[in-house]
Every structure is written in C-alpha cells, then in structure tokens.
Amino acid sequence: MSRVVALVLCLLAPPVCGAAEFSVTPIRLYFEPGTRSAAVTVTNEDKRPLRMQLRLMQWTQDADGADVYTDSDALVYFPRLMSVQPGEKRLVRIGLKTPAGAAERTFRLYLDELPDPADAASPPAHSGLNFTIRFALPVFLPAAAAAKPSGAIEALTLRDGKLRVAVRNTGNRHFRIANVAVRAGEAFAAEAPGWYLLAGASRIHTIDIPAGVCRGLRRLDVTVKAEELSLQGGLDVEPGMCAP
C-alpha cells in the first residue's frame, strides 16, 4: 500500500493525537538503468497543513544481516523542508550524483512530519500524546552490470531444538524474503518471517521445534521464498539435535 495512515496510531493513543494523514507514491523507488532522476509524490489527506523534513540515509546490513543506516549525501534531493496544504500534492525530486557501481546501492529517504507550531504554542488542556509520522522510503540504485537476484542457503543447523537457516544474497541486487518455511511431512510445519536481504549480505533465520515433536522427526525440508526466487534445502534429524 502507498498510504501512510496516522489514524492507526491515533486509535492506539489517548484522546489527543497530532499526527497527520498523508500518502507517499511510490512506496519503493527503483532507478531504472540509465535513469538519472526520479520523483516521489506526497499527498496531504488531512484537514490541516502538513510540514515535513527530508533526510537521506545510506542503507547497509552488518555481518548478522541487521539494517544499518548512516547519513548520506550521495543523492541530490529537494525540497528538504516542505509544507503541503490539505488536499494538495507535492513532488520530491531525487537525482544521482555518481554513475552506477558494481553492485546495487541502497538508501532510505526519511520523510518526517514536523509538529505543528500551533500545537506547541497552545498545549491541549486535557491529557494526551502528540504523534508525528516518519516514513522511510527505500531507494534502490541499480548496478552497472545486469542485475539478477541470486541467493543460497549457506548452512542448516539444528541444535537444542533450534533450527538455524543461514541465507546469503550472492547477487548484485537485493531481494526480499517473504518467509522461511520448514516442513517435516505432516508431522511439523512452521514459518519465520523474512525481510530485505541486500547484495552480499547474509542473515540467520531461527525456528523453534518443540522437543516432543523434534524427537519424532527424521528430516526437515526448508524453503526460502522470495519475490523472484526460491531456495530449497534439507537436513537429516538426529535425536541429539533436539532440546532435552
């Protein structure tokens, strides 16, 4: 969905909620090969003005596959501060500074709602919380060479009833894992949620297998389901691999 709905946060909050409602299109920005610029549309769907600040962060992943964000000026983007009136749309333009590299480069463009100065000047008489919205737009810059998703299950281990599935992105572009599914015939089935796996990164997904179930298993079949690829693996189970 392209819509950032502040109403959800308001329903979870006490009577006062200061967050605006707006939409961002697209929700993921892909630069096509040879493209030097792109645009994002922000629509104010609220009844009051929307003030926003924009900030670019480089998006990488560490040795464990955890997301790491650092300030970046690798792209040109404007405006960096903007006001959007109710019902209006504003374009955010993004441009490249340098040519494509050997691997895809990934960023997040943060669109932060700024508090309404009137709210700060005149606090509500009744108690409550004021929320603002942050939207993190993924931005993908393609590699110079043809990009094709490629991955591998590096390792499958079962120890003390914990199945660990190590997945590596062996390609030059990201892919998004939908889930990691494990099955043992009709005896056991489970899934672990997935996430983005950037080029060259790896992540371990863990699935717990109950001790009583684990001891009756002979083999586990694992499938890593991603948007554009599927990886399969298997592991023979021995009782000593299960939780005591």
Model regions: which residues?
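N-terminal signal peptide c-region/cleavage motif recognized by signal peptidases
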Residues: A13-V16
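Asparagine-centered strand-capping/turn motif at beta-strand->loop junctions
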Residues: V42-D46, A166-G171
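Intrinsically disordered, low-complexity Pro/Gly/Ser/Thr-rich segments with frequent PxxP/GP/PP motifs
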Residues: D67-A100, A187-C214
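Bacterial N-terminal signal peptides that target proteins for export
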Residues: M1-A6
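Short, hydrophobic/aromatic beta-strand segments
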Residues: R48-L56, G65, G151, H174-V180
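Short aromatic-acidic-glycine turn motif
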Residues: Q58-D71, P117-A118, R183-E191
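Terminal connector regions
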Residues: K97-P142, A146, G212-P244
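Beta-sheet-dominated interaction scaffolds and their linkers
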Residues: A19-E45, L81, A145-D160, G194-Y196
